[in-house]
Each structure stands twice: as structure tokens, then as C-alpha cells.
């Protein structure tokens, strides 16, 4: 009977313990990445001047005839290594099969350019990227969207209109493109989508808005 009771208690409590541990990893590593990358930007500005002058929206590696990325051809990687890498602790860099840059950190997290033809949107992974599929349904679960767009880039196709008002002049920020400034919109844009955004695009911003803690009413099951 005693063993049976222990088994029942374990079956009830273990999933909660696992879920709470996962939440803690997400919260801690999101906050750490946000702090670390923006400190790196501040340090880089001391040497390179205002970030709006050295930011650029650059593409990833070119793909060769053999279908593999051409080593050394990623403009995004060259930019990152010039302006941010010297001020961050990095364990390794990779180029994925589509030419996108992936940066790995000592705590097991990583960040990757979302697109192969631009470097203003980034996906942060609290844990191994290989364990999190590319589907947008994973945004807010194991992948979290950021944008770095302090100014209109020389090589980008963006603007400085009101859609970017929560990014222009700032560092790496949770994705807030087209946000109307309302807290309820962050919730809606995390649960499904808000206006023109992709699904779950605002989950990172929702967590930031709650002091880098996952809200009790977080709309996505982790």
C-alpha cells in the first residue's frame, strides 16, 4: 500500500517538477541572454560608435554547388564577429544547411538568425537548437523571437516607420514589430497571432513584460 501511495504521489508531482524546471531554465536563460547581448552592444559602441551606424541587415552563407554552405561567405557571421563576439562568451559558431548563423553559449543556450537573407530577426533557444524544430508552433515553447533593428540598415529592405518603434534606437529586444503597446496584445500575439505577425511572435515580449517570468496565465503549454 505504501509503495502504491508513493507511486501515485510521484506520478502527480514529477511532471510538475519537470515543468517547473523547464520554466526556470527558460526564464533564467532568456534574461541572461538579453542582458549579455545588450551589454556586448554597449561595449562595442565604446569602440565602434553608435550602434545605428554599424548595424546592418546582412545575409548568411552562400550555398555551393554541392548543396553545402560555402565557408567564410556569411556576411552576417563577419558582422557578428566584428561587432559583438569580442564582448561575449561563445563556445562555438556554426552555419546551418540553409546558411544561417548559429551562436552557442556556455550555459547550453544558442541564438540563430531566423532568415538566411537577413540578420535583424533572431531565434533564441534556451536549450539545444537541434531539439526544437523549425515550426512556428514552437515559438514560445523552445524557441523565442528577438529583433535587432536599431536603425534602417544599408543592406536591408526595412524602414523606420511606426511598425518598428519598439526597436529603432534600441538593442536586441523581444520581437515587438507592429505591436500597439497594449499588454493584452502581447498575450494575444503569444497565444495565436496579433495583426500581421506570425504565430506566437510576442511570447518573448510577454515574458519580458512580466519581469522575465512566465506568467501564470501563459497561453502556451510548455
Task: Tell where the protein language model's regions lie, with residue ranges.
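Membrane-proximal amphipathic alpha-helices
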Residues: 19-34
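Alpha-helix exit/C-cap motif
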Residues: 38-57
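Extracellular/luminal recognition modules and glycoprotein regions
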Residues: 25, 49-50, 66, 73
Amino acid at each position: 500500500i505504501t509503495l502504491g501511495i508513493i507511486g501515485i504521489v510521484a506520478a502527480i508531482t514529477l511532471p510538475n517538477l519537470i515543468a517547473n524546471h523547464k520554466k526556470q531554465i527558460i526564464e533564467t536563460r532568456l534574461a541572461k541572454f538579453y542582458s549579455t547581448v545588450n551589454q556586448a552592444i554597449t561595449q562595442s559602441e565604446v569602440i565602434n560608435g553608435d550602434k545605428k551606424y554599424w548595424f546592418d541587415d546582412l545575409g548568411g552563407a552562400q550555398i555551393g554547388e554541392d548543396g553545402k554552405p560555402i565557408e567564410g561567405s556569411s556576411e552576417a557571421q563577419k558582422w557578428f564577429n566584428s561587432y559583438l563576439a569580442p564582448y561575449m562568451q561563445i563556445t562555438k559558431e556554426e552555419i546551418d544547411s540553409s546558411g544561417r548563423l548559429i551562436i552557442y553559449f556556455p550555459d547550453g543556450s544558442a541564438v540563430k538568425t531566423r532568415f538566411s537573407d537577413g540578420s535583424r530577426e533572431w531565434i533564441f533557444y534556451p536549450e539545444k537548437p537541434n531539439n526544437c524544430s523549425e515550426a512556428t508552433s514552437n515559438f514560445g515553447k523552445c524557441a523565442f523571437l528577438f529583433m535587432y533593428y536599431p536603425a534602417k540598415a544599408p543592406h536591408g529592405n526595412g524602414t523606420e516607420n511606426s511598425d518598428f518603434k519598439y526597436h529603432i534606437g534600441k538593442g536586441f529586444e523581444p520581437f515587438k514589430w507592429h505591436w500597439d503597446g497594449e499588454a493584452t496584445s502581447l498575450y494575444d500575439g503569444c497565444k495565436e497571432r496579433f495583426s500581421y505577425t506570425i504565430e506566437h511572435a510576442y511570447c518573448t515580449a510577454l515574458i519580458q513584460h512580466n519581469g522575465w517570468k512566465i506568467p501564470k496565465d501563459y497561453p502556451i503549454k510548455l
